[in-house]
């Protein structure tokens, strides 16, 4: 199978790995009012999805071994579509249940995508990783921008959430023939697992795996914390839901150039620590700005959102790219990313819930402080990972 065809399929699947999640925050206040939910319970919807992403990430290497990487990848994205359909029923139970299915599918798919890139697109792993993360961001941008208009057009917030089943199932159908043609050649060509990294076991004793887990915990906490609470935060500042949803869409768009360019630059220059540190600094400055000066004259919120998005846009793919660069083959990449993403998503799943509780109890400043703590954890991990050859 030609690498370009595999890349096309990967991009189609990846576009669905944030769309279902990003469509919920602009509707969060509407959902709360309609279903009578507290901020903590409304945050649990997103937290449940992200925690199930952690479960899916931990299970990813076992799913890879049992069902085959390419076939399991298609099935995981199909599960995202099914979960979106379940969320089309306007009830708190189905909202949470559908989010659980979506989260598990995203978690498994994220691990398997790293292995597919290592196996079929290893020559340009940094660019390929940046490309599929950009596809994820485009999906998130479209979803967040259209969430409120779709709710108005289709007659309710539940329809706006359910509609994202369509692209997920279409992408699965596109991937099916690619998976059928790539599975056997890939299996025949794959080298045996390296010492200490087994397909069915997570590499807890591996230094890179542990450090990238800490890194992903920091960047994922910041990403999903802002994804869940950026629009509601500015709702609380007096913005309309449409304007807050547009800010979230701009936040998503701002991630795209960083995700596309920075991993490739880091790969070419062999300066992973420099770029990771620069991106973390951008996200931290934006977070501090949003906390200290949420509504300075005219353009302030947009500047903070773009600084945050630029830093987080490159932060996530840099964490995946360093795994692809420093692991010997696809099985090792899947196992290492499974541990890193599992730990990262566990932290990120707890963060929106904790932030929701803090919003109810103390207000948004205490909630945003959680994100600054995550930035400190990420900074330590960046320093310890270092550059290649250290």
Describe the function of each predicted region.
Residues 71-85, 274-289:
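Structural signature of the two symmetry-related core transmembrane helices
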């Amino acid at each position: 199978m030609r690498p370009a065809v595999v890349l096309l399929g990967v991009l189609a699947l990846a576009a669905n790995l944030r769309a279902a999640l990003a469509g919920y925050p602009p509707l969060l206040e509407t959902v709360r009012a309609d279903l009578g939910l507290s901020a903590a319970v409304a945050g649990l919807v997103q937290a449940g999805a992200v925690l199930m992403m952690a479960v899916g990430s931990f299970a990813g290497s076992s799913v890879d071994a049992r069902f085959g990487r390419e076939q399991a990848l298609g099935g995981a994205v199909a599960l995202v579509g099914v979960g979106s359909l379940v969320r089309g029923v306007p009830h708190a139970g189905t909202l949470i249940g559908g989010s659980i299915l979506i989260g598990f599918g995203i978690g498994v798919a994220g691990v398997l995508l790293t292995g597919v890139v290592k196996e079929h697109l290893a020559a340009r792993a940094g660019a390929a990783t940046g490309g599929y993360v950009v596809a994820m961001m485009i999906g998130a941008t479209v979803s967040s921008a259209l969430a409120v208009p779709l709710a108005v057009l289709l007659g309710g917030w539940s329809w706006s959430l359910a509609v994202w089943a369509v692209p997920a199932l279409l992408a699965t159908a596109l991937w099916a023939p690619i998976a059928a043609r790539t599975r056997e050649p890939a299996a025949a060509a794959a080298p045996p697992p390296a010492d200490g990294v087994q397909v069915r076991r997570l590499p807890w004793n591996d230094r890179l795996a542990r450090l990238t887990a800490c890194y992903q915990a920091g960047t994922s906490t910041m990403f999903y914390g802002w994804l869940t609470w950026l629009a509601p935060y500015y709702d609380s500042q007096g913005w309309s839901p449409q304007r807050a949803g547009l800010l979230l869409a701009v936040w998503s768009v701002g991630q795209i150039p960083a995700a596309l360019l920075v991993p490739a630059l880091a790969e070419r220059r062999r300066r992973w620590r420099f770029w990771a540190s620069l991106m973390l600094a951008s996200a931290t400055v934006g977070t501090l700005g949003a906390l200290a000066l949420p509504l300075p004259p005219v353009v302030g919120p947009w500047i903070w959102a773009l600084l945050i998005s630029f830093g987080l846009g490159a932060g996530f793919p840099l964490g995946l790219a360093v795994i692809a660069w420093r692991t010997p083959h696809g099985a090792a990449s899947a196992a290492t990313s499974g541990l890193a993403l599992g730990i990262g998503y566990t932290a990120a799943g707890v963060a929106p819930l904790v932030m929701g509780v803090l919003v109810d109890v103390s207000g948004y400043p205490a909630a945003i402080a959680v994100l600054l703590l995550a930035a400190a954890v990420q900074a330590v991990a960046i320093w310890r990972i270092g550059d290649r050859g250290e």
